[in-house]
């Protein structure tokens, strides 16, 4: 009887933006009655030092770089090759270890960046499902490129509103990051053999794109992967993200400061855990936000790019510059008026589900396409215009966009729209909602194995 509970081994690509949605999905599966084990690379495990007492088990696998992670690999190609070799073996070891237990592993949910995990699952007769951490729209464009040998013809018949500058950067900047482009295309090399394809989105947000992609594979949208306490509140213990590679020792100062600011008055500025701005762009951004009350997260690796003397001139009562922030708590604070974002998918989903309008400054990969949807499809913000030759967003354009979102004529419409998306996100997670139903479908398949 215990075997019928089902046991999912979840294998994320070892970066913060992938680990977080996997961890959150594991919480949903545990809530639905499945046993879940999250597989972290040895290097990430040692970096995070996670609490092992919770209901979700943690296991370690090897990517071949146990002492230094990706940064110690000679290239992305070498890293992926070694991850496949070492990862396949160590995942198989975990499966074999559990075979004689009360809860043998019955399913592998693997990051779509790691398609070889499907072969490991099939070797042991397990359910296998890739998890795409980017939205349906972006994945569909990558899929079209994959079946056309890496090329993409515009206009896209099913998505005619997309222009070159709206596409992922691999298309708009030809030849950029070839190894990463190959990685996103390889997501589809065997995905038609999977039991389902899981996507971190929700049906109402991408109804058309979901239908398009569902013609090629059995798509289940299982997002938003935001802690339950902020949305449906069905999982009382799910109060926040709890596996962080980047973390401050004290969150309270930031939140206490926000609590002193007027409602809707603060511009929250954050560019995620990977985006790197040029010195020129940092100078333009610093000049633009100086005219507002702001909370700006500048990672340690980016701090030296700030204009000389900028930090000393920041009025601590009006504005803050931090190395890290508890983003969920920040976005849910009434003081936040808009989110100036790089449009990474996790940040975009968080803003939509917290009802915070966005000023979009996309940098690379899926971000330009997310920005297009933010402005023209979901009508939840504006995209900052950039210089054609340099690609730099000038201070005047940034300032104009912030004003447009905070106080312009379209501001009320944007705020109304983001509230609509928040309400639909909550509805999708409530009992009988689209995401809740999709998770039930997945759970039934795992339990039947």
UniProtKB/Swiss-Prot annotation:
<dbReference type="GO" id="GO:0080002">
    <property type="term" value="F:UDP-glucose:4-aminobenzoate acylglucosyltransferase activity"/>
</dbReference>
<keyword id="KW-0328">Glycosyltransferase</keyword>
<dbReference type="GO" id="GO:0090704">
    <property type="term" value="F:nicotinate-O-glucosyltransferase activity"/>
</dbReference>
<protein>
    <recommendedName>
        <fullName>UDP-glycosyltransferase 74F2</fullName>
        <ecNumber>2.4.1.-</ecNumber>
    </recommendedName>
</protein>
<feature type="binding site">
    <location>
        <begin position="364"/>
        <end position="367"/>
    </location>
    <ligand>
        <name>UDP-alpha-D-glucose</name>
    </ligand>
</feature>
<dbReference type="GO" id="GO:0009696">
    <property type="term" value="P:salicylic acid metabolic process"/>
</dbReference>
<dbReference type="InterPro" id="IPR002213">
    <property type="entry name" value="UDP_glucos_trans"/>
</dbReference>
<dbReference type="GO" id="GO:0035251">
    <property type="term" value="F:UDP-glucosyltransferase activity"/>
</dbReference>
<feature type="binding site">
    <location>
        <begin position="325"/>
        <end position="327"/>
    </location>
    <ligand>
        <name>UDP-alpha-D-glucose</name>
    </ligand>
</feature>
<dbReference type="GO" id="GO:0005829">
    <property type="term" value="C:cytosol"/>
</dbReference>
<comment type="function">
    <text>Glycosyltransferase that glucosylates benzoic acid and derivatives. Substrate preference is benzoic acid &gt; salicylic acid (SA) &gt; 3-hydroxybenzoic acid &gt; 4-hydroxybenzoic acid. Catalyzes the formation of both SA 2-O-beta-D-glucoside (SAG) and SA glucose ester (SGE). Has high affinity for the tryptophan precursor anthranilate. Catalyzes the formation of anthranilate glucose ester. Is the major source of this activity in the plant.</text>
</comment>
<comment type="similarity">
    <text>Belongs to the UDP-glycosyltransferase family.</text>
</comment>
<dbReference type="GO" id="GO:0052639">
    <property type="term" value="F:salicylic acid glucosyltransferase (ester-forming) activity"/>
</dbReference>
<dbReference type="GO" id="GO:0010030">
    <property type="term" value="P:positive regulation of seed germination"/>
</dbReference>
<dbReference type="GO" id="GO:0052640">
    <property type="term" value="F:salicylic acid glucosyltransferase (glucoside-forming) activity"/>
</dbReference>
<dbReference type="Pfam" id="PF00201">
    <property type="entry name" value="UDPGT"/>
</dbReference>
<dbReference type="GO" id="GO:0046482">
    <property type="term" value="P:para-aminobenzoic acid metabolic process"/>
</dbReference>
<dbReference type="GO" id="GO:0018874">
    <property type="term" value="P:benzoate metabolic process"/>
</dbReference>
<feature type="binding site">
    <location>
        <begin position="342"/>
        <end position="350"/>
    </location>
    <ligand>
        <name>UDP-alpha-D-glucose</name>
    </ligand>
</feature>
<keyword id="KW-0808">Transferase</keyword>
<dbReference type="GO" id="GO:0052641">
    <property type="term" value="F:benzoic acid glucosyltransferase activity"/>
</dbReference>
<feature type="binding site">
    <location>
        <position position="273"/>
    </location>
    <ligand>
        <name>UDP-alpha-D-glucose</name>
    </ligand>
</feature>
<dbReference type="InterPro" id="IPR035595">
    <property type="entry name" value="UDP_glycos_trans_CS"/>
</dbReference>
